[in-house]
Amino acid sequence: MAELAKKGGSGPKVYSIAAHRGFADALVTGLVPRYREDGFGLARLTLLVPSTRARRTIAEAFIRHFGARGEAGLLMPRMAVVGDLDLDEALGPLLDPLGAEGIPRAIDPMRRWLALARLLHEELGDKAPKGATLLRLARETARTMDRLLAEEIVPDDLMEPRVLDLVGDLAEHWQASLVTFARVQKRWRSQLEDWNAVDAATRRNLLFRHAERRWAAEAPATPVVAAGVTSAAPALADLLRTVSEMPSGAVILPDLDLAMDEAVWDELGRAGVAPEPEAEPFARGDAVSHPQYHLKLLLGRMGVARGEVQPWHRRGEAAGPPERSHAISALFLPPEASRRWIDLPADKRRLAGVRIMQSATPEEEAQAVALLVREALEMPGKRVAVVTPDRALARRIVDHLLRWEIVADDTAGRALSQTAAGRLLLLAAEVAAGGAAPVALTALLMHPLAHGGMDRRDWLAQLRVLELALRGPRPREGLAPLAAIVTARASANPALPQWWKRVEAVLSPLLALPETGGLADAIGVLVTAAEALAGEALWAREDGRALARFVEELRLTARETGTCVEPAQLDLILRDAMDEVAVRPPWGGHGRVAIYGLLESRMSRADLVICAGLNEGVWPARGTADPLLAPPVLRALGVPGADFRIGLSAHDLASALGAPEVVLCRAARDESGPAIPSRFLLRVQALLGDLLDRHTETRALDWARALTEAAPSEPYPRPAPKPTAEQRDVAISATALDRLLGDPFQFYAEQIMRLKELEAVEEEPGPKWQGITAHAILQRWHEARTTDPQAEIAPIMTAVMEEANAHPLLRALWEPRLLAALEWVAGEVRASEREVLAVEAKGEMNFDGVRVHGRADRIDRLPGGGLAIVDYKTGAPPSPTQVKAGFALQLGVLGLIAERGGFADAPGPPEAFEYWSLAKSDNSDTGFGFRETPVGRRTGPSEEEFLPTTEARLREGVRDYVRGSRPFRARENPDYPAYATYDQLMRLAEWLPGMDEDAVE
């Protein structure tokens, strides 16, 4: 570059690489001919870059540049990251290290986090939040401090008149927050002085100031170029100004719009430059969400006019068409200027090579993006970059690419909490926090890394036995209920007790953590448990190494600060901390595919760039106000508004749009429902106008849908299985007859196929569990009355609940209502003239060669000698109408068994049939419990027809199904109130809508 080659000069040397040129490649293309000629050439050059990722991107650009020209070796420039806390050492001889000795070290971020939590607790006193909430507040406080420190705002600035004048107009909570923040900051500064340390942001500022003074006094003998640095922090802006004025220095900016009209440039707002001394540097109307705003802010703080910035004329290998930059400029016009779209000429809105793809779901979007990547790789040498801030979408794309053995690493990484090693430690913390709750416990023991020193298959075999036993309502906390479950199943599984000893040895320390103990000690217990389960595999991969660094640092820091936690908060605290740690993949992915986050995508370029996840709340992310300082306070202090980051996201998209080929994609729905298109995507669509159809990508969507769409198939018929006579030869229970007649398929699935529904782990206690428990209590109470007629039912209820390992919360909610209902039953039984003959009585009979059996909850002897059959219900009993319709035949079948002498302990004719409900009742003295009979009611069967009708229905079931050949058709009677247990098995949703009325009848 001729301009860059000049020595000296009266003005700053600032350049801009247009979006369509590709920053890193264009930068290298311009630097190489200027600096490689004499001596060590490029090795004499120092590049100041914004991030470690940018350093890697530029290094790759150098390698591509020389590789394309067949040159084997090169000495690359020294590259220093401006945010490096050891910038003085990175610059080496260019910056006298001795001169930086007076700059204190930076405080460790984790130590600052825990120390701020302690200060907040002391400042807030009784109002201080507890546990994880306090630590979250400390993290937010640290972020706000960093935001102010980057702007060189010190605690004393919070007490200046420009801020104090605003306090009276603020809401009460903002006032309290400001006072607390100011006090904590002041105490924190005092603490740092005692430690002879500074915040990381302060150290960076001091290093920038030191370098600025050193180079302003004596410029380095070798060239220094700041490339891609766009941070507008005042100290860094001053350093960049100094670099631009050095004889061999220059500043190169990405994507500064030099063609923008001055009127539009002015419409962006003040951007840090107050029109008068007392005015705020940021106005309410500033277009902080514009992609050029942060660059205007930087130029203003550097003291460089936009007219002084020169265009960089070199271009990279993956440069886009020049007219693309004009379209990008028009695309992001501020609100007033966007009226010009109506009169824009074609060359100003030309977006050739840009396509828009709108999928239905994130899954379809990921599949379509993977197909676009796969297609692009068919062309030799073509590079593809997928840019998205949605890490879940990125993981889906990575998984889909594995279909073709394309290994694409997500360079943005994953949070440590979402990796295998991190998740294992978190699950151990959840077990400690929840007292070995079944969901957390089974998840921990089933973790892919867990084996407990055994063969993994043997480990899982025993675990499945325990997991099946834990299905149902949550037991009470602790290991004792689990040990009782293991003991109860030891006879059927001899290896289970030995396996449980291993597990118990791991879990016992987790559940023995003190109520309020040291965080360091708790982490040590968690690590020991995780190692006992996973062994060395816990630390073997990159996530394990990251976890090792994390736990060691947190443990040491927590011990130094004396941080204490409750076990119940342990998992929340660790998850919050691990979410801040990114685990990036090692090298080894496909050389021509990259998946970036927004930060990682800066300065990178590819032949095809796919911008995915373009929905509001994703790209751009939702703008959130500072939780501690009110927006007017931040404006008065000279801090950009909350939407500033939206402008950075817009700049990232503008940079990506400069690629030769660009695909912008979104999903119409996400996991929560309909999604709103990104404001950036809506601008692209509006700019294209009538040309939008020409820029729509549909091929990839068609391919993606073709991969998931199955070939058309015939409508699934209504199931009507016809088992053999041998398979049909099953008994009929009293509760199954109505299912056999109303929905034969359910009977077939349950009695012939022997399929039973599995309860979920920690399932909410439902009617089935409540019924079993209530029946067990009543059975024991009746049995106790045989020896003690005055036996109380409450102690029996307590004992049954203890044996059932019922969770304390469940007991607290249900026991009072249950006890009231049970007391009603006890009172009714004591006051009755009946004699209780049998409880939970099993009976059976042979009916036309088929065994019919049932269990009567209670059988009473009536004063006249007949029998009363009682059925307990925890909820509302079947109505007389349902009984008459044949939808509730249990009492009738039990009556037939009793009539034929099927109950050995209760001979006699059945005369009464009753439901005793434990549900709420206004007529009960206790508020719960009532009895009713379906027989003899106006809408129910008469006493004379009840048993004969039941017998006829039983004979029909035996004749047609058990002894006959009638198919077990699904939903034979559509009015039958069937359970949904087997709906999926019968594929109900596939055939029910098309079932014709004749078939129904």
Language-model-derived ranges and their functions:
Residues M1-D788, T798, E803-A804, R811, ...:
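Polyanion-engaging groove/track-forming segments
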